[in-house]
């Protein structure tokens, strides 16, 4: 009988903001880390939660997302002061993060600012992007944290603003539901049912082929576009370019 221990850390961060052009983390700082420990698919209560002083002002847009004020952070520790404790907490675990590129980008940037030759996070942790997992399970569907909560009937009523620990706790519940083998057949058949209903009421019209030349984006261009929209939606809560 296997006695292997699987340790996962479900993690989320809040930041001073993000860049729309270039590296999304450059010049910005992490102001909150929330992490929830899951061992063998059980929440242990051994969580990591800290607010951080960024030594810079927050962007107004970021404040609108998480509601954390500059004044509140003045007496909080800096990332440098908690870095060792944080690394000890996550080292060797599988990190589960929704749109992992956002948070890992910030974490690696913060580590690099310490000038201690700390390696990339993915060298001492396995990183799993729960957004990528959700997209494979539900292609073409909305897979934001709120959408997944609705799909799995998980209570997120307290999520009026983004908060790292609350979001990590909610994501832990969502991820356990996603990977627990209890997905309702209704999820898989949702699109098929809608299509069948639509075909009963829609009259198909054959149009003449257009002579206009249509230029399609390449796979790389589409991937880059989706990655940027992910970052916008991650910390904005919504994205104008997505339904």
Residue ranges and their predicted role:
Residues 1-124, 135, 147-161:
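Conserved non-catalytic scaffold segment of RNase H-like nuclease domains
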Residues 12, 94-100, 106, 144-203, ...:
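Acidic, Mg2+-coordinating catalytic module of metal-dependent nucleases/exonucleases
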Residues 124-142:
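Catalytic subdomain that performs nucleotidyl-dependent activation
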């Amino acid at each position: 009988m296997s006695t292997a221990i699987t340790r996962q850390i479900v993690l989320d961060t809040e930041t001073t903001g993000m860049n729309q052009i270039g590296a999304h983390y450059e010049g910005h700082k992490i102001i909150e880390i929330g992490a929830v420990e899951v061992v063998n698919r059980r929440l242990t209560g051994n969580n990591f939660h800290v607010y951080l002083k960024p030594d810079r002002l927050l962007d107004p847009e970021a404040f609108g997302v998480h509601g954390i004020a500059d004044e509140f952070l003045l007496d909080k520790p800096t990332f440098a002061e908690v870095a060792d404790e944080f690394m000890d907490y996550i080292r060797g675990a599988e990190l589960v993060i929704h749109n992992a590129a956002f948070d890992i980008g910030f974490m690696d940037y913060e580590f690099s600012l310490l000038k201690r030759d700390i390696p990339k996070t993915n060298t001492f942790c396995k990183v799993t992007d729960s957004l990528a997992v959700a997209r494979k399970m539900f292609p073409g569907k909305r897979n934001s944290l709120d959408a997944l909560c609705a799909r799995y009937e998980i209570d997120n009523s307290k999520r009026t603003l983004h908060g790292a620990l609350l979001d990590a706790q909610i994501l832990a519940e969502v991820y356990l539901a996603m990977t627990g083998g209890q997905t309702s057949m209704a999820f898989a058949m949702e699109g098929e049912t809608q299509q069948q209903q639509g075909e009963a009421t829609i009259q198909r019209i054959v149009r003449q082929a257009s002579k206009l030349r249509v230029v399609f984006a390449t796979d790389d261009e589409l991937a880059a576009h989706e990655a940027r929209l992910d970052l916008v939606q991650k910390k904005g809560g919504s994205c104008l370019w997505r339904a």
